[in-house]
Design a protein with these regions (language model features):
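Metal-dependent amide/peptide-bond hydrolase catalytic core
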Residues: 1-176
Length: 176
């Protein structure tokens, strides 16, 4: 049997996993069979790296927001219309740095597992119109044209600027 368990926090995941182990043991006893548990991987929450996030936010603000052409805005609205979302176009803003939610919504990611081993800094870049469902044809369509390209180039610049800061500032590295 293959199973996957999820929880918003690592401690909660451990408790759920212990329950799964008990269920497997009980099921094996009822069926009078042997069983073996193999843990393949985990998907834990991402540990917040506030110092790294602040360093990256500084570069995001220094670079400024992405500007979009009228044609890109029109395309974004067509994507929103096709996916049943309000036709507001694509935002050209820089959001302020916010505290990470205690239990952030969204899917699981193995980035959380990585964050338990090495510091992780995450950046969200606009590559599709607001409200576009991720893992959909609409995001793929935007990624293959200037909206997605601008977002990735912008993100690349911000990441590079942050890496230069880390290279130049050993204290920043140790604080992260």
């Amino acid at each position: 049997m293959w199973t996957r368990v999820r929880d918003g926090k690592r401690d909660g995941l451990v408790e759920v996993w212990k329950q799964v182990e008990k269920i497997a043991e009980g099921a094996a006893m009822m069926a009078n069979v042997d069983y073996k548990i193999t843990l393949i991987s985990g998907v834990h929450e991402v540990l917040v790296n506030e110092t790294g996030a602040k360093a990256m936010q500084k570069n995001l603000e220094a670079l400024g927001a992405i500007s979009y052409t009228e044609e890109e805005q029109d395309y974004a609205k067509k994507i929103q219309e096709a996916t049943g979302k309000p036709q507001v176009g694509i935002e050209s803003i820089i959001s302020p740095l916010e505290k990470t939610a205690e239990f952030p919504m969204g899917g699981s990611t193995d980035v959380g597992d990585v964050s338990y081993v090495v510091p992780v800094i995450r950046l969200r870049a606009t590559t599709a119109p607001k409200g576009t469902p991720w893992h959909s044809w609409a995001v793929v369509a935007c990624g293959g044209m200037s909206i997605g390209h601008k977002g990735m180039r912008h993100a690349s610049k911000i990441l590079a600027m942050t890496m230069v800061d880390l290279y130049k500032d050993p204290k920043l590295v140790s604080d992260i």
